[in-house]
Amino acid sequence: MITSAAGIISLLDEDEPQLKEFALHKLNAVVNDFWAEISESVDKIEVLYEDEGFRSRQFAALVASKVFYHLGAFEESLNYALGAGDLFNVNDNSEYVETIIAKCIDHYTKQCVENADLPEGEKKPIDQRLEGIVNKMFQRCLDDHKYKQAIGIALETRRLDVFEKTILESNDVPGMLAYSLKLCMSLMQNKQFRNKVLRVLVKIYMNLEKPDFINVCQCLIFLDDPQAVSDILEKLVKEDNLLMAYQICFDLYESASQQFLSSVIQNLRTVGTPIASVPGSTNTGTVPGSEKDSDSMETEEKTSSAFVGKTPEASPEPKDQTLKMIKILSGEMAIELHLQFLIRNNNTDLMILKNTKDAVRNSVCHTATVIANSFMHCGTTSDQFLRDNLEWLARATNWAKFTATASLGVIHKGHEKEALQLMATYLPKDTSPGSAYQEGGGLYALGLIHANHGGDIIDYLLNQLKNASNDIVRHGGSLGLGLAAMGTARQDVYDLLKTNLYQDDAVTGEAAGLALGLVMLGSKNAQAIEDMVGYAQETQHEKILRGLAVGIALVMYGRMEEADALIESLCRDKDPILRRSGMYTVAMAYCGSGNNKAIRRLLHVAVSDVNDDVRRAAVESLGFILFRTPEQCPSVVSLLSESYNPHVRYGAAMALGICCAGTGNKEAINLLEPMTNDPVNYVRQGALIASALIMIQQTEITCPKVNQFRQLYSKVINDKHDDVMAKFGAILAQGILDAGGHNVTISLQSRTGHTHMPSVVGVLVFTQFWFWFPLSHFLSLAYTPTCVIGLNKDLKMPKVQYKSNCKPSTFAYPAPLEVPKEKEKEKVSTAVLSITAKAKKKEKEKEKKEEEKMEVDEAEKKEEKEKKKEPEPNFQLLDNPARVMPAQLKVLTMPETCRYQPFKPLSIGGIIILKDTSEDIEELVEPVAAHGPKIEEEEQEPEPPEPFEYIDD
């Protein structure tokens, strides 16, 4: 057994090259044991490698590489490994080889990334030996069928040739394509390279045996290429593949931005016969009047009904097909279907609201209850609770009245056709001026009903804002207009809001500043930024500054590194409100990107800024950046949740709520639980609201602590001595937990993985309830119906069932609260004589004996009852339109005997086009009527009575 390598090392000093070669071979065999000893003479081995005439110089490089590896000098080790050429065996499983390959890939990646950012002439040449090892690694991955690993390395090293080759050579091309698309959506931070990858994916998808148009369009949304999408839709219509075109249109509406959709609509309009403007489509420069609107609706209905009875061979005219596609893309169709779903499946428990109403004793909690009611009934059009409690509702005065009126907009969200009739009593009238708070709230409500889908209502709100007589109506009008014209970047709307901002009125200015951001959402408009930041630095009103702080951030939505210069200047501003705006701008620009630089900036500000509001905003903003990977958020904010600063603790709670919304994440709930007992009341408020955001739509089975939190909300609300702040949080939490009649969830991304812009905006503005309660209503923008809606070729809902392959209780609605039974009044105890007591004792003994005889019978009866209790089935059939929670989608299938086949997997959910495989007549789901005030039709006057003779007695 060798105890020293000294003898072998001494051979390196010999003159004979063969002895040196022998020594190197021996050293290679023992280097792992004697590397420390060999390291003292490593210079001799290096000299041998540098000697061009030495035959085994590659072997010298290999030994030197191993010595440096053991010394921890990985860079030198890598250099010598490259010098070893083929002697460095990439297929070896040793720790040395694995480490050097990792270093090699890191080094190669770094060089490739640096080169990618340089112009063509300045690119540095990459060491061919380095590339050779990386290529061998790629081949090894392919040989071992480790395709995901190869795709990961190919994307990191920017090798699109290998990326494409790996996908095409894999044994599961659709699976690899889906994996690659997911990587593009969630992990890629460089926009330019991501676009190149998406182009490759589009090419592969299109070259498949059966082109996958649905996923191609998802890629094209990311590439911001509406023209290509329009071309695909036209191609599908020409090929008579209408159902696929409709499915793509629904997916586009759910995932694409307003600008993108309006470009596609514009392109479709220019193809073939010209088409009348479609009601509801946003982003058109001129909006049709209400008369045209009703005309186009009528013709639309006539054309669609004309084809119901036709044979399958007769295809509709191209004009009608394009009309339908535009109706879907404008969002009108999806909004109508979601409204139908929410009205039909409304499962609100009014008992919860009644108990809360009976417990509240002050105006703040009164407002909170009104907001909670609107959340619970969001989109259901059911205002029953308000009608039943008109006297209680009338207690709302001033701004509380404004909030209460606006809450109707949340209840009737999406109920667009009758919006003006519904709100008629609350809107400004020419004849007599009503309550300004009511009128302002009414205009805000109209905006909430038409959020992100303005159409004709934009012009109505524009005129109302022009003619508004006081600051309260202007406040509501600005918010309503901002919501309806969200993301349209319409110049006339922008100019009017800017005029309102420049009036230097605090109440008007706050809403106008926010509305400017909503209208210019994500536009990165330099003029808008200049106007808003310039005015923010001039104004003395804190309210206006607060509105602009959020507005500025919204203009930079989704702009990533393009917003860095603005973020830098805002973060350096001496005004804390503008620094807070910097935090929100980071949140909006990098939302959903998981960008490390953005996270580092927020964490730094969270612990270093001198202003509490800025620190709180910085921590809250973490939730927006991390929402694609909610499991990461608890570890990032866990230390912040224990901060000595209560504002940071509040921010940590809200960050968890935003990031893990709707997931039921156990770690997040475990962090929030101790915060519900925090000594500071507003931290408790944040923890209560965040817990509801996380546990929305969760059941006892999917999230065991949900009932415990329900009881906690109730306890806080009913405790007379608890603080108003905590009560406000608990009441809002109740509303969020049961939102939309138990049929909606909160998610910041669409079903297909795109960032859902209205949700992000809604949640950001919702967090501003800290300063201004009426902004709580913005959370309604983030509510997404959890539904599967199947449609036939005529875009009607057929009667069809879906099979949920799990026990019904797993995703069931929560049991309603029981009405408490009235307690019987206790009888006053009477004096008992000793004789009576003895007599009663004897009677009891008799009864006992009889009971013993009866026991057998009762036991038998119990057994019978247990037998009757049937075991729970392992599946459940759900009727179309079905309430299907996100986790339930995985177990959803079509019944085997079903005549319909879905155009895309049911596991994605949402609106799905169904292909009918039968010739039989279809049964359709009857639409249900919306609730709310109806305009009473004039009754016909009764006929006069028959003539008669009056005889006076």
From Swiss-Prot:
InterPro entries: 26S_Psome_Rpn2 (IPR016642), ARM-like (IPR011989), ARM-type_fold (IPR016024), Proteasome/cyclosome_rpt (IPR002015), PSMD1_RPN2_N (IPR048570), RPN2_C (IPR040623). The modification N6-acetyllysine is found at residues 310, 720. GO terms for molecular function: enzyme regulator activity; ubiquitin protein ligase binding. Residues 279-318, 839-881, 930-953 are annotated as: Disordered. The modification Phosphothreonine is found at residues 273, 311, 830. The modification Phosphoserine is found at residues 290, 315, 834. Component of the 19S proteasome regulatory particle complex. The 26S proteasome consists of a 20S core particle (CP) and two 19S regulatory subunits (RP). The regulatory particle is made of a lid composed of 9 subunits, a base containing 6 ATPases and few additional components including PSMD1. Interacts with ADRM1. Interacts with ZFAND1. This is 26S proteasome non-ATPase regulatory subunit 1. It comes from Homo sapiens. The lineage of its organism: Eukaryota, Metazoa, Chordata, Craniata, Vertebrata.
